[in-house]
Amino acid sequence: MSWLTNLPPGLKNVFGKKDTPENLWIKCPKSGDLVYKDDLEASLFVTPAGAHLRVGPDLRFKSMFDGSEYEELELPEVVKDPLKFKDDRKYVDRLKSSRAKTGREDCMAAAIGKIGKQNAVVLVQDFAFMGGSLGMAAGEAFITAAEKALETKSALIICTASGGARMQEGALSLMQMPRTTVAITELKDASLPYIVVLTDPTTGGVAASYAMIGDIHIGEPEAMVAFAGARVIEQTIREKLPEGFQRAEFLRERGMVDMVVDRRDLPAKLGQILSMLMGGKPLPEVEPIAVADVEELEAAEAEAAPDEVVEVEAPAVDEIVEEKPAATKAKPRSKAKSKAAPKTDE
């Protein structure tokens, strides 16, 4: 018997095993350092190295709405397993495990509140729920949120995070792509803003539908936004893709994303945008270029021009004579006689 087993109760509490919560330390994917979880929660799960970790709807709602005050929308129920799908596991079993993991019925959650004192409906896709895949439940959630935005004359904001359409629902999941597009069209007809926050990752059918038809596209730093994966593209075209391909910064340089905003600055940026689009706040004034600046610019351009400029005067239209080659008349071919000449008797 070890002497540690004969310790008094007080010392046993000191030297005994303690239950430690899981994921107390989280490894930064960018630097490899371990970061204390409480520190991550205070920084909205942005590591000191700047990596934006994936977060769920609860944290999104609390950080985006004014004063963390919002009301979650009740989303309609859909048929759970319309195709009775089964691969290595039953689809219903996958749904049960994802619900137990996230505490939600599906990957999409919606809430209404104020951002920058402006009415807004916010949709959040949870990548922890079956990869945020788009299915019937997510499609109904999107349409419900769009209808709420139309009813309350609010902006619709969505934070996308998805691997694409949910294969376990087949064509029923693909049908959600045009359905969500129609809902967005109704928002635009009502002159209500539709803003997309592209988070990591936004791929597949989601990137091919409602994720890329917003009025304004905001990307989180280094978020992957693509239809197909980089490895698939490289194997198809047999070429090496450029560095940073399909990342938010790469898309920003090429005009597919309007801005890249740190998650901690996102509420203020959204409030600024909504106040301009919905609050009647005038756009920031742009100072006109002074005449002196224009003259300096013209002088700089003149210095950069070649020393000698040869001007060629174009001929008048009347003076242009189009010479046509002389037409040569082809000799007609002799026609063959259709009847043979008659024989003559000598």
From Swiss-Prot:
Domain (CoA carboxyltransferase N-terminal) ranges: 24-292
Region (Disordered): 300-346
Any Gene Ontology biological process: fatty acid biosynthetic process
Name of the protein described by the UniProt record: Acetyl-coenzyme A carboxylase carboxyl transferase subunit beta
Known role: Component of the acetyl coenzyme A carboxylase (ACC) complex. Biotin carboxylase (BC) catalyzes the carboxylation of biotin on its carrier protein (BCCP) and then the CO(2) group is transferred by the transcarboxylase to acetyl-CoA to form malonyl-CoA.
Organism annotation: Hirschia baltica (strain ATCC 49814 / DSM 5838 / IFAM 1418)
Similarity comment text for this entry: Belongs to the AccD/PCCB family.
Database matches in HAMAP family: AcetylCoA_CT_beta (MF_01395)
Gene label: accD
Catalytic activity: N(6)-carboxybiotinyl-L-lysyl-[protein] + acetyl-CoA = N(6)-biotinyl-L-lysyl-[protein] + malonyl-CoA
Subcellular location: Cytoplasm
Complex formation: Acetyl-CoA carboxylase is a heterohexamer composed of biotin carboxyl carrier protein (AccB), biotin carboxylase (AccC) and two subunits each of ACCase subunit alpha (AccA) and ACCase subunit beta (AccD).
